[in-house]
Regions:
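Short acidic/glycine- and proline-prone juxtamembrane loop motifs at membrane-interface regions
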Residues: 210-223, 268
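Transmembrane alpha-helical segments
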Residues: 70-78, 269, 308, 468-469, ...
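Interfacial juxtamembrane loops and adjacent helix segments
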Residues: 100-154, 158-162, 409-410
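Hydrophobic/aromatic-rich transmembrane helices and adjacent perimembrane loops
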Residues: 95-96, 214, 221, 415-430, ...
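Transmembrane-helix motifs of polytopic, lipid-linked glycan transferases
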Residues: 45-53, 169-192, 230
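Transmembrane-helix signature of polytopic, membrane-embedded enzymes
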Residues: 185-207, 226, 244-252, 457-460, ...
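Membrane-interface alpha helices of multi-pass inner-membrane proteins
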Residues: 26, 188, 201-203, 250-267, ...
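Membrane-embedded, hydrophobic transmembrane alpha-helices
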Residues: 1-63, 248, 286-433, 437, ...
């Protein structure tokens, strides 16, 4: 079925094309249906043309239909249990609010009505800001504005859901992305492990809680998974030896554009772009027609993605510079090393002869080092980092030794094993070691490069780097989404390859009546044939259990969990309690962290934060802002999300307008999550009739 092999690639091409076209529209404030929809239709035409150029994989019809059903079921499951994370606490809230603002204001940047906030003098007061988590303040004085944290591709895609059906459409968009991502992963798996085992691998991926969690809330991971898997699938096709050179060049260019285009969704995808450079070098060394187009597409898309980040997300780049600088260094080192390798005509014979063993042992040792780190290493960051205070609070609440500087990076192999199981992890390791050895043999003997070259090198290396340094607050299940774009797909593909190999061996195992070389004696052929299918079936059932069983068991406790239910209604209540001419002055820490963009972007009420000191609202700063708001002819409304006391201390009469009891995901540091935690969402308003005391 061509649909299975081409739908994911077409969807990924549409995502990347739409993201490319949207950047100037978003920057110029033109992202509105009347302009965007024609552009998106052009992107559809491009995607259809691109998808038709991708060769299909032969296979039984039942396998293709099963794969589609698995992908649809995964998307429906995520959609039926979707979160309503709007009141901002984590990245999902940032994406949701950015997308809502983009859909309604037609640009990512948030304009700030400086006079309505008390004027430039009030904003210059110590402790007064328009910034909040996920939204940076840019400029000063009358030119102050707010910039969302992340790259524009995900908000652009989510904004389409808003245009379709408001909050419901926006919150369901990631589930649609997840279904397409599973289809793209399945298409990649069909090329690597065959149509039948592709169904098992895709089902296992859909069952893992981190993947389900990413599809339930407004995260970028489903779209990154979609484009990344499609890029890998096209690249496998581009290294096929059954196509003519012109087709291989076309597929190589497409693979490069898609691979580089992932960085339009997630900036850390620059890591995978860098890791493709050695692949390009190997292809070039074998004079593959794919090499140059692949490099051209990769370079073009990566440069465009980085330029986009500089244009619309510059503050975010500064915030993650500690992660980006090593990536930039890796690009330079890998590019330089690849160029040097291409110029070396003769490698030392001792190295060439032992290359298969060297690569296999290096793979095994790399895993051993990563997996053993909890025995001999505790990874820490600066205790002054804002994340360290969060970790310290979680440690205290969970009865752990308080050490806020811990990142728990050394535990990442364990995180992965939580969701796929130790057997699948060991199967993946065995497959990775075997593939490393086979690659060494191909390089040593000058044989043709295998089609799995690029996914194996990039997938294994990126998995190792992600596990080495995940770069995320280590509470679960939130931190586990770092495993979604590359780690879990790579592990499950390798495990599926190992199971397929073992199943094939079981199905063709020599009987007691085989000849010494393992072939069946002629007069025993019928008897051998009657036995071998049983071994294959048993091995297949066991393999399927090893792939999907642990994932299903780990996810089962949270399979039907819906978090943040009621937040859409809570936001509506907050907006209804405010009126035209109001200016929201947020005076406690929780209000300052969770509500500024909700009130500013969703309710349309100018909002300013007055940071408290030691838990006490800054009275002098509040007085300055209130006076400036009044001078502008507006009504200042003090806002608290922690308690009414913060408003009463300032002389305002507090009225609770939001009183929601809901749930959120657990925030565990050392255990696999298996449930939800209670969450209170409150909001008090205090209109100021006279100056605060």
């Amino acid at each position: 079925m061509s649909l299975v092999d081409r739908a994911g690639v077409g969807a990924a091409a549409w995502v990347v094309t739409s993201a490319v076209f949207s950047v100037p529209l978003v920057a110029w404030g033109l992202w509105r249906p009347s302009v965007a929809l024609p552009v998106l239709l052009v992107a559809v035409a491009v995607a259809v043309r691109v998808a038709r150029s991708v060769p299909c994989v032969a296979g039984p019809r039942w396998a293709a239909i099963s794969l589609v059903l698995v992908a649809v079921a995964g998307g429906v499951w995520a959609g039926a249990t979707h979160a309503e994370h709007i009141v901002l606490r984590r990245d999902a809230g940032t994406y949701a609010l950015s997308a809502q603002h983009l859909a309604t204001a037609h640009r990512l940047g948030v304009d700030v009505d400086v006079p309505a906030l008390g004027g430039a003098a009030a904003l210059a007061t110590a402790g007064v800001t328009v910034a909040s988590p996920g939204f940076y303040a840019r400029g000063s004085g009358a030119r102050t504005r707010v910039v969302p944290q992340f790259l524009p591709a995900t908000p652009v895609l989510l904004s389409l859901g808003w245009w379709a059906d408001g909050w419901t459409g926006l919150l369901l968009a990631p589930a649609v992305g997840l279904a397409l991502a599973l289809l793209a992963f399945g298409a990649l798996a069909r090329r690597l492990v065959g149509p039948a085992w592709a169904v098992a691998a895709t089902a296992a991926l859909a069952l893992t809680q981190p993947v389900l969690h990413a599809g339930r809330a407004t995260y970028s991971e489903p779209f990154a998974l979609l484009v990344g898997c499609a890029a890998a699938s096209v690249l496998v096709a581009a290294t096929s030896r059954s196509l003519e050179d012109r087709a291989l060049r076309r597929l190589g260019l497409l693979a490069g554009l898609l691979a580089g285009g992932v960085a339009l969704v997630r900036i850390d995808a620059l890591r995978e772009s860098a890791l493709l450079l050695p692949v390009v070098a190997l292809l070039a060394a074998r004079r593959s027609p794919t090499a140059r187009p692949l490099l051209a597409g990769l370079g073009l898309a990566t440069v465009y993605a980085f330029a986009t980040a500089l244009l619309v997300s510059r503050p975010y780049l500064g915030a993650v510079a500690g992660s980006l600088l090593p990536l930039a260094a890796a690009v330079v080192v890998l590019a330089g090393g690849s160029a040097v390798a291409l110029r070396v005509r003769r490698w030392p014979r001792a190295l060439v002869v032992r290359l298969p063993l060297v690569l296999a042992v290096a793979t095994l040792l790399g895993f051993a080092v990563l997996a053993s780190r909890p025995l001999w290493l505790v990874v820490r960051q600066s205790a002054a980092d804002p994340g360290a205070r969060v970790v310290a609070g979680l440690q205290l609440a969970q009865g752990l030794a308080v050490d806020g500087g811990r990142t728990y990076d050394e535990e990442t192999v364990g995180w992965t094993a939580w969701w796929v199981g130790v057997p699948a992890l060991l199967l993946a390791l065995a497959a990775a070691v075997l593939l490393a050895h086979r690659l060494g043999v191909a390089l040593r003997d000058g044989a043709a490069l295998p089609a799995w070259l690029a996914p194996a090198i990039v997938g294994v290396a990126s998995t190792a780097l992600t596990l080495y340094r995940p770069g995320i607050t280590p509470d679960h299940p939130w931190a586990d989404r770092r495993l979604v774009p590359v780690v879990l797909p790579t592990v499950l593909l390798l495990a599926a390859a190992a199971v397929r190999h073992l199943t094939a061996r079981a199905a063709t195992a020599p009987s007691p009546h085989s000849a010494p070389d393992g072939t069946a004696e002629p007069h025993r052929v019928a008897r051998v044939r009657s036995r071998t299918p049983v071994g294959g079936v048993v091995a297949g059932v066991v393999g399927l259990g090893l792939l999907a069983g642990p994932a299903a068991a780990a996810t089962w406790p949270v399979a039907g969990q819906r978090t943040e239910r009621g937040e859409v209604a809570a936001v509506d209540q907050a907006c209804a309690a405010l009126r035209p001419g109001d200016t929201a002055v947020l005076v406690d820490d929780r209000a300052a962290n969770e509500w500024p963009q909700v009130l500013r972007g969703v309710c349309g009420v100018p909002s300013v934060v007055v940071r408290s000191r030691a838990g006490t609202p800054g009275t002098a700063a509040v007085r300055t802002v209130v006076a400036g708001v009044r001078a502008a002819g507006r009504r200042p409304v003090l806002v608290s999300a922690g308690s009414a006391a913060a408003l009463e201390q300032l002389g305002a009469s507090a009225r609770q307008v939001v009183d929601l009891r809901t749930t959120e995901d657990q925030r565990l540091l050392t255990r696999r999550p298996g449930g939800s935690a209670s969450l209170d969402v409150d909001l008090w308003l205090g209109p100021v009739s006279s100056g605060p005391s």
